[in-house]
C-alpha cells in the first residue's frame, strides 16, 4: 500500500508526537484505586435522614483533590437503605449558592413527595418529606432534578443510591452484607483537565460524553471480596452514555434484579447493557477465580488519546469498570444460586388504554411539544394499566415517574432476558411497547414527569407531565 505525500507527512508527524508523549497518554494513566464505599445511611426507629447538599473536596485520579459538589461532605451521596412498611423522613438542606431540586428515581411515591421543580430549594432552604415505603425490594437512586440544570447538577455530584429492602430480600440466600459481599457500583463518564478538575460544556445537541470512566468517584477501581457470590448493584449515573458490560474472562453475569425489583429467577447474561438511569443487580461467582474485571467495551487507542490532547474526545481512555480480587475470606453466602426469587403474576383488572408517544431530539420534544409546566400532557387513573407505544427519531433512554412497566416488545420483537422484570427506565432504539401500571397518584400542581433520561435533553424540554387521579376519584 502506498502513501500520498500528505498522508506520509501526517503519519510522520503523529509518530514524532507519539514518541514525545508522556507515558500517561501512551498507557493507562490511572493506577488501580480501592473502590470507595459510600457511607450507609439507614433509618432506625423513625430517626430522620439528613442530606446536606454542599461543596466538597475529592480526588478522581488519586492525586489532586479538587472542588466538587456532593452530599454530606462526599462526592456523590451516602447509600440510603429503607425498609418496606416504614415511613422515612428525609431532610434535604441546600448549602449551595443556587437553587436545587432533588428526587428519588424508582421510589413509588405520590406526586406531592416526588420532588423536582415543585420542590425547588433556594440557597439555605430545606425540604423534609416523610416518604412511605410501600414497594418490593429494589435498587433506586436519588439525584438532582433541577429545572434546566439537572445535567450540570448530576455531573457535579448530586446523586446517590437508595436501597429498598423487604421480606423477600431478607429471606433469600443472596449476598446482603453492605460493603462485604454487596456493593454499590455507580458509573459516570467525565472529562478531567490536567489537574483532575471535571470539565463540563453542554453539547449543542444530544448529551454530554466524557473520555474518563469514573466508578464511585474514581478511575480504575478494585475491590477485595470473599470467595463465593458477590452482589453488584449497578447504576448508570452518566448524563448520556450507555454501557455494554461484560466480564473479562467471558463468563456470564447472573442478573437478579432490575429497576423496580428482583426478577422471578436469575438470568445468565453474557453482555449487560446499562442505559442512563438504569439499575441492574448482578451476581458474580468468585469461588474459583483469583480476579476478574468488568469492562465496558473497547478503550480509546493511542491515536485517539493523542487527538484528545487537541480536541475533546468522546472515547473512553479506559473501559475497566471494576476489578474484583478474591481474598482468603470464606464466603458469607454458601448456598447455591436460588432457582426462584420472587413471584410475579400481576392481575390486570381494568381495560388497557393505548397511547402513542414520539420522542424527538432536543428541538422536537415529545409528540412535537417541548415541556410546558402549565400544561398536563397525559391524565390517567391510579391502578390503571396502559399500553404505551413509544417511537424515537434518536435512540435514547426513557423514564416515567410514579409507575412501573414491563417491556412487551422492541421493534416488534420480544425483549432480551436483561429487559425482563419491572422497570421504570428503558433504552429505546426506534420503537418500544410498554405495559404501564399507574401505581401512585399525582396532581395538577404536583404532576409526575416522563422524559428522556439523557439529562441535557430533559433540560431542553424533552419531557411531559402526567396526572394520575387517585383511586376512586
Curated annotation (Swiss-Prot):
Alphabetical GO CC annotations of the entry are: cell division site; outer membrane-bounded periplasmic space
What biological processes does GO assign it? Answer: FtsZ-dependent cytokinesis
Instruction: Write down the PROSITE patterns for this protein, in alphabetical order.
Output: TAT
Signal sequence range:
1-27
Q: What GO molecular function terms would the record report? A: copper ion binding; oxidoreductase activity
Residues folding into a coiled coil are none
On the tree of life, the source organism's domain of life is Bacteria
Cellular compartment(s): Periplasm
Q: Mainly localized where?
A: periplasm
| Pfam families the record matches | Cu-oxidase_2, Cu-oxidase_3
Please provide the record's keywords in A-Z order.
Cell cycle, Cell division, Periplasm, Signal
Regarding how it is modified after translation, the entry says: Predicted to be exported by the Tat system. The position of the signal peptide cleavage has not been experimentally proven.
Could you say which protein family the record assigns here? Belongs to the FtsP family.
Primary role = Cell division protein that is required for growth during stress conditions. May be involved in protecting or stabilizing the divisomal assembly under conditions of stress.
> What NCBIfam families does the record point to?
PRK10883.1
**Protein name as catalogued:** Cell division protein FtsP
Amino acid at each position: 500500500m502506498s502513501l500520498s505525500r500528505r498522508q506520509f507527512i501526517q503519519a510522520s508527524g503523529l509518530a514524532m508526537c507519539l514518541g514525545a508523549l508522556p507515558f500517561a497518554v501512551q498507557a493507562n494513566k490511572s493506577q488501580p484505586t480501592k473502590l470507595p464505599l459510600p457511607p450507609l445511611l439507614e433509618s432506625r426507629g423513625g430517626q430522620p435522614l439528613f442530606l446536606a447538599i454542599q461543596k466538597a473536596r475529592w480526588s478522581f485520579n488519586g492525586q489532586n483533590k479538587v472542588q466538587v459538589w456532593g452530599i454530606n461532605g462526599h462526592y456523590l451521596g451516602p447509600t440510603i437503605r429503607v425498609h418496606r412498611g416504614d415511613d422515612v423522613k428525609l431532610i434535604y438542606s441546600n448549602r449551595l449558592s443556587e437553587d436545587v431540586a432533588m428526587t428519588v428515581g424508582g421510589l413509588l411515591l405520590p406526586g406531592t413527595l416526588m420532588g423536582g421543580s415543585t420542590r425547588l430549594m433556594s440557597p439555605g432552604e430545606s425540604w423534609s418529606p416523610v416518604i412511605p415505603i410501600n414497594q418490593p425490594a429494589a435498587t433506586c437512586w436519588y439525584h438532582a432534578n433541577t429545572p434546566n440544570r439537572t445535567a450540570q447538577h448530576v455531573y457535579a455530584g448530586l446523586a446517590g443510591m437508595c436501597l429498598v429492602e423487604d421480606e423477600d430480600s431478607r429471606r433469600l440466600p443472596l449476598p446482603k452484607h453492605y460493603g462485604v459481599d454487596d456493593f454499590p457500583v455507580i458509573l459516570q463518564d467525565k472529562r478531567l483537565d490536567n489537574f483532575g478538575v471535571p470539565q463540563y460544556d453542554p453539547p449543542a445537541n444530544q448529551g454530554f460524553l466524557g473520555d474518563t470512566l469514573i466508578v464511585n468517584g474514581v478511575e480504575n477501581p478494585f475491590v477485595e471480596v470473599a470467595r463465593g457470590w458477590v452482589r453488584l448493584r449497578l447504576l448508570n449515573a452518566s448524563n448520556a452514555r450507555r454501557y455494554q458490560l461484560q466480564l473479562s474472562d467471558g463468563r456470564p453475569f447472573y442478573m437478579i434484579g432490575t429497576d423496580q425489583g428482583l426478577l422471578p429467577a436469575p438470568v445468565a447474561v453474557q453482555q449487560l447493557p446499562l442505559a442512563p438511569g438504569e439499575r441492574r443487580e448482578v451476581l458474580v461467582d468468585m469461588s474459583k477465580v483469583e480476579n476478574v474485571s468488568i469492562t465496558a467495551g473497547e478503550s480509546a487507542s493511542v491515536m485517539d488519546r493523542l487527538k484528545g490532547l487537541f480536541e475533546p474526545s468522546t472515547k473512553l481512555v479506559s473501559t475497566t469498570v471494576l476489578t474484583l480480587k478474591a481474598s482468603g475470606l470464606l464466603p458469607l453466602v454458601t448456598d447455591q444460586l436460588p432457582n426462584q426469587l420472587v413471584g410475579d403474576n400481576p392481575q390486570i383488572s381494568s381495560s388497557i388504554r393505548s397511547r402513542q408517544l414520539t420522542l424527538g431530539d432536543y428541538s422536537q420534544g415529545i409528540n412535537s411539544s417541548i415541556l410546558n409546566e402549565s400544561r398536563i400532557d397525559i391524565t390517567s387513573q391510579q391502578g390503571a394499566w396502559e399500553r404505551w407505544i413509544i417511537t424515537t427519531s434518536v435512540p435514547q433512554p426513557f423514564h416515567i415517574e410514579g409507575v412501573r412497566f414491563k417491556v412487551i416488545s422492541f421493534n416488534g420483537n420480544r425483549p432480551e432476558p436483561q429487559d425482563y422484570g419491572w422497570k421504570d427506565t428503558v433504552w429505546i432504539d426506534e420503537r418500544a411497547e410498554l405495559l404501564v401500571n399507574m401505581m401512585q397518584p399525582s396532581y395538577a400542581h404536583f404532576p409526575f414527569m416522563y422524559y428522556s433520561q439523557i439529562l441535557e435533553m430533559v433540560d431542553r424540554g424533552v419531557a411531559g407531565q402526567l396526572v394520575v387521579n387517585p383511586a376512586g376519584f
